[in-house]
């Protein structure tokens, strides 16, 4: 399965070990004893396995909690699988939406308690350039006010998308390669995005994964 889809531009499949690490980090200090409902969002959901693992972990902590999952995906094949999987699991398939997250945001105005995602590594955003730049000009009304990364790597755009959708006291776990940590000179778009994250105290931790964790990629 991963050989069929994983080599498409920047696409890669995430092992369950990594997903469970992310879910456990997100839920490490969560108070879920009171029940209720929580929302989970994946901006590049693939086949929605991160969403299903997050739901599983939350309900292991408290079976009385309702979990509502939301996701967006641009690959038609994996989107179809995600929507079918959500239906089988008894969720709302209408919360699984098709489209390019950077240029066709299907969840504008939404806020989520948990965001978990593994968006594409090092893929350019030339196709989305017009839409992204137009949204950046909206300032605080858009997702990309803090700055724009270099055109050759859109990873930081996904980070900004996630931050724009966090509910108060919400948490996000996102996988990136090393580029967003170091790219760009002082005062450049990538640098200003990092400044925005740090000055607003958005960053709790950076976890370095081992090598060869992603199939069908040269990512170490």
What are these regions (language model features)?
Residues 5-7, 179:
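Short hinge/gating elements
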Residues 67-70, 142-146, 209-210:
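Short beta-alpha connecting loops at secondary-structure transitions
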Residues 1-2:
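Long recognition/docking surfaces used for binding and targeting
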Residues 8-9, 103, 137-140, 210:
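Glycine-rich, flexible loop/turn motifs
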Residues 79, 148-219:
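Conserved Class I SAM-dependent methyltransferase catalytic core
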Residues 121-124, 128, 134-152:
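Conserved catalytic motifs of ABC-family nucleotide-binding domains
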Residues 8-16, 147-152:
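Short acidic-aromatic active-site loops that bind/stabilize oxyanions
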Residues 12-117, 122-133, 176-179, 186-193, ...:
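Conserved S-adenosyl-L-methionine
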């Amino acid at each position: 399965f991963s050989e069929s889809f994983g080599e498409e531009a920047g696409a890669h499949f995430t092992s369950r070990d990594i997903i469970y690490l992310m879910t456990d980090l997100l839920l490490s200090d969560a108070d879920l004893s009171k029940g209720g409902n929580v929302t989970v969002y994946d901006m590049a959901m693939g086949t929605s396995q991160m969403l299903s693992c997050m739901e599983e972990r939350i309900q292991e902590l408290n079976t009385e909690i309702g979990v509502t999952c939301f996701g967006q995906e641009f690959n038609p094949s994996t989107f179809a699988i995600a929507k079918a999987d959500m239906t089988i699991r008894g969720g709302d398939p209408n919360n699984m939406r098709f489209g390019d997250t950077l240029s066709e945001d299907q969840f504008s105005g939404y806020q989520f308690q948990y965001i978990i995602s593994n968006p594409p590594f090092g893929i350019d955003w030339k196709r989305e350039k017009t839409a992204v730049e137009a949204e950046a000009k909206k300032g605080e009304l858009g997702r990309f006010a803090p700055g724009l990364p270099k055109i050759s790597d859109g990873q930081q755009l996904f980070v900004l998308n996630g931050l724009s959708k966090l509910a108060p006291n919400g948490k996000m776990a996102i996988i990136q390669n090393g580029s967003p940590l170091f790219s760009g000179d002082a005062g450049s778009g990538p640098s200003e995005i990092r400044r925005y994250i740090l000055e607003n105290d958005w960053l709790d931790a950076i976890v370095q994964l081992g090598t060869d964790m992603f199939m069908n990629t040269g990512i170490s």
